[in-house]
Amino acid sequence: MANYLGYEFIDSATVIFFDENGNFDAEKTDKVLSKKLEQTEKAVIPGFYGAGPDGNVVTFSRGGSDITGSIVSKACHASMYENWTDVSGCLVADPRIIDNPQPIKVVTYRELRELSYMGASVLHEDAVFPVRKAGIPINIRNTNDPEAPGTLIVESTCQKPDYTITGIAGKKGFVAVNIDKD
């Protein structure tokens, strides 16, 4: 891909790091990756993996490419992290249960985290941390429908929601009820 685009290829194992226990090393990664990206105008960086202290490849869990995109967005101080997937953003309900659920236009990081924890899986929940900390919004977009606006994920919104309930997600064997009043 990098050759086709004429961009520099950056091997994730040289800029994304894990500790000896296999945990992501955010501090070292941000330092090395930020420095590398300062010296690079355009690059292709594959997702899903990095390197351990011994240099061997270590992978993120399922959805690791979402995390990689978030890490790179933070390191290059992006104004937006666009995550392209096979759906037009986050939906108000699981399409396997509810026919033709509508996409959510805008959702906060907190609301998305709660939906992800309860089974909504359009974006890996760990992909939220790096960009949220940096104040970078996320836009979930559909590769098969690039004109669709997707779902914008932000810290907070002054926009009045279309619905009282942002979304519904479920997980067998788990119940949580949270009610907030503004």
Where are these regions (language model features)?
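Short, glycine-/Ser/Thr-/acidic-enriched flexible segments
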Residues: G50, S65, H77, S88, ...
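Flexible, glycine/charged-enriched surface loops at secondary-structure junctions
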Residues: L123-D126, P137-P146, I179
